[in-house]
């Protein structure tokens, strides 16, 4: 099932008991965060605050607060089915020619999907039903959340930032937090390696001193939103990828102030520019680490046009110590990463980003080990293969007999199969998340790999231990007589 806009997804969630309307007045200043946090930790529904204090625009929160809802947004019923999305991405990243007639027939569905890639331009889009320009633009009238007591100002969190570089044909969609600075100004916090920042850098080099056009969409359809946080190939637009997932072309329209295309069914559109000379100090804000981050200087986004649907809905979230909404997104998108990694490294059995690790800072990988040093090769490959793992600080590699998603198994493997000196890899001066205050220098720190696999000849001179396993016939006999033993609640082994 696909959703043309955010509202149709809201209706679907409500029909399936996955959304709760809240009519009681709730303040966007701190109260919404506390309510959403409690509901998310209880694995509760998405929330539609219909009466935010001081505003008549409803606020949608906790939309992707469970992996199930992430899957539902992509037309799947179970997060494990998101591996289909990963298979598609793996194919797009490295398409292989058919090996024969049968293989060509088998690949037809993927080629059919590719026909849905180009976005479709529409006229009179819903996102431009109401148009405000000049003095009419007032961002303070939006119900922007002030998430934590120590936050410096309200923060736009789910803005889909649309940019285009002078060297690319495709547009880039990215999600970057934006601090409210004034009636028509936001601080665009994009890190240097992100698509929007790279587009801006290229533009400044080619057009020094000129204003850079930027558009931010709030409340786009769920597939387009998730396309912006998925490892789409660099040469492909997120609009094209959203069309592939949806099974029909993404509807876009031309922005009023520039040539950028925006999601036509979005709830709110902010259009404007970044002056390369205008910067501002951003933060501090509570973030996904569970701490307040340092302040730093980022470009200022000046909003010249604000358009929106009639009776628009403001889409928002908060970030904090896991679990939070980004952590739940990480759990769901974990299934997308597995086929992509397997395509490059077929020896990988499973891959896990534990949500406690702030979504991406730790990874556990199980492999079918084939030679001495294999675990170290996989570590290096994972760090290098996808941009999403550039900031992963810790990688643990285990054998296929270890469930990499079970901490009991992983800790057992670490403590019995590792020698700290021999099996630990330390790499200095690597890219690290700017928000990681534990690193000695902002944006630059070390990485640690742990080889918790069984060691082969050449990796150790000692006889390696043999795992204890009960005789299968004995286990079956005990199963047969268990009810006669009078022992209750026995685990099934």
UniProtKB/Swiss-Prot annotation:
Top-level taxon in the UniProt lineage: Bacteria
Cofactor binding remark: Binds 1 prenylated FMN per subunit.
Catalytic activity: a 4-hydroxy-3-(all-trans-polyprenyl)benzoate + H(+) = a 2-(all-trans-polyprenyl)phenol + CO2
GO cellular component terms, A-Z: cytosol; plasma membrane
Leading EC class: lyase
Requisite cofactors: prenylated FMN; Mn(2+)
GO molecular function terms noted in the UniProt entry: 3-octaprenyl-4-hydroxybenzoate carboxy-lyase activity; metal ion binding
NCBIfam families per the UniProt record, alphabetical: PRK10922.1, UbiD family decarboxylase
Membership in a protein family: Belongs to the UbiD family.
Protein name: 3-octaprenyl-4-hydroxybenzoate carboxy-lyase
Organism: Shewanella halifaxensis (strain HAW-EB4)
């Amino acid at each position: 099932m696909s959703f043309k806009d955010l509202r149709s997804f809201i209706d679907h969630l409500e029909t399936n008991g996955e959304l709760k309307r809240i009519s009681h007045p709730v303040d966007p200043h701190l109260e919404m965060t506390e309510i959403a946090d409690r509901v998310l930790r209880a694995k509760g529904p998405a929330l539609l605050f219909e009466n935010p204090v001081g505003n008549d625009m409803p606020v949608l929160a906790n939309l992707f607060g469970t992996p199930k809802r992430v899957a539902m947004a992509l037309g799947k019923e179970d997060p494990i089915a998101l591996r289909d999305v990963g298979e598609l991405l793996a194919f797009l990243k490295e398409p292989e020619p058919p090996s024969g007639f049968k293989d060509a027939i088998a690949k037809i569905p993927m080629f059919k999907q590719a026909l849905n890639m180009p976005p479709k331009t529409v006229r009179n889009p819903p996102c431009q039903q109401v148009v405000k320009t000049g003095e009419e633009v007032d961002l303070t009238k939006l119900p922007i959340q002030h998430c934590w007591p120590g936050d410096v100002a309200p923060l736009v969190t789910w803005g889909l930032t649309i940019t285009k570089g002078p060297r690319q044909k495709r547009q880039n969609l990215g999600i970057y937090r934006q601090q409210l600075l004034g009636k028509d100004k936001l601080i665009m916090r994009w890190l240097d390696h992100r698509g929007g920042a790279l587009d801006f850098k290229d533009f400044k080099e080619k057009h020094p001193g000129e204003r850079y056009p930027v558009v931010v969409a709030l409340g786009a359809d769920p597939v387009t939103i998730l396309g912006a946080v998925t490892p789409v190939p660099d040469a492909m637009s997120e609009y094209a990828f959203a069309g592939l997932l949806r099974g029909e072309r993404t509807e876009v329209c031309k922005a009023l102030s520039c040539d950028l295309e925006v999601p036509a069914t979005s709830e709110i559109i902010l259009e404007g520019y970044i002056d390369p000379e205008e910067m501002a100090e951003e933060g501090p804000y509570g973030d996904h680490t569970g701490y307040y981050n340092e302040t730093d200087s980022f470009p200022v986004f000046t909003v010249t046009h604000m358009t929106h649907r009639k009776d628009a809905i403001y889409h928002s979230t908060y970030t904090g110590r896991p679990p939070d909404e980004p952590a739940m997104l990480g759990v769901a998108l974990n299934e997308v990463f597995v086929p992509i990694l397997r395509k490059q490294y077929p020896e990988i059995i499973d891959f896990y980003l534990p949500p406690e690790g702030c979504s991406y800072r730790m990874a556990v990988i199980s492999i079918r080990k084939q030679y001495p040093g294999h675990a170290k090769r996989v570590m290096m490959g994972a760090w290098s293969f996808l941009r999403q793992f550039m900031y992963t600080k810790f990688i643990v590699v285990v054998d296929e007999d270890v469930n990499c998603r079970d901490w009991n198994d992983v800790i057992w493997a670490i403590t019995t199969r590792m020698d700290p000196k021999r099996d630990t890899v330390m790499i200095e001066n690597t890219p690290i998340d700017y928000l990681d205050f534990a690193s000695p220098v902002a944006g630059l720190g070390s990485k640690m790999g742990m080889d918790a696999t069984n060691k082969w000849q050449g990796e150790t001179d000692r006889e390696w231990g043999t795992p204890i396993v009960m005789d299968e016939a004995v286990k079956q006999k005990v199963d047969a007589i268990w009810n006669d033993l009078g022992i209750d609640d026995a685990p099934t082994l």
